[in-house]
């Protein structure tokens, strides 16, 4: 990265622009010149939505050290303001689902995501925009959840959930069950752009995943039950509840 452009105090340098994924935020491949590692740099502008909230949320995310979360390494609040994160790494969940996953693998992936979000919740952070694009599987087999501390603030989702302190936990919990259903069946329980929708029962709930997932066996009946309870309004209220509902899994 000999042509990288230093920013701020000079510790970080910008090497190349990445495709935009968030409004009014410019993503770059960057370099931490002190630790000699590749990073992702999110450059904010005066037009970035909810700019102050984004910087505050990202600053709290620095304190989350769970390896399953895309780490936020540093936050610069001056001009230019920017956020330094761990690069996204590994294969996206959508690719893995397309190739087919065993029920045990889906249980493990969603369980690991749930535990990671539980760690974030203890810091007052929530994803609120969890999707198949938010989850990756690294080459070493660990999951990586991207966007914590950044996406929700930029999209204004933190503000929408602020009126009810428990609403953010419920949103992430339901999203985890949606990912579980998608991972098992290759169908989305509802409507989502680019994904086929799951068939529904007479009351509008998605059919049990076992009706569509050939990899499920009788021991996976708890997954059917978790889905049914969620669409009956009796589902888990937080990521930690989802993790407990999934029981044990092999994270290797």
Predicted regions and their residues:
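Conserved N-lobe loop of protein kinases adjacent to the ATP-binding glycine-rich P-loop
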Residues: 30-38
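AlphaC helix of the eukaryotic protein kinase fold
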Residues: 45-63
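Short beta-strand micro-motifs within the conserved protein kinase catalytic domain, predominantly
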Residues: 71-81
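Short pocket-lining segment of the protein kinase catalytic domain that shapes the ATP-binding cleft
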Residues: 83-91
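AlphaC helix of the protein kinase catalytic domain
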Residues: 93-102
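Activation segment signature within eukaryotic-like protein kinase domains
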Residues: 109-110
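Protein kinase catalytic-loop region centered on the HRD/HxD motif
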Residues: 114-125
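C-terminal lobe helix-coil module of Hanks-type protein kinase domains
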Residues: 158-251
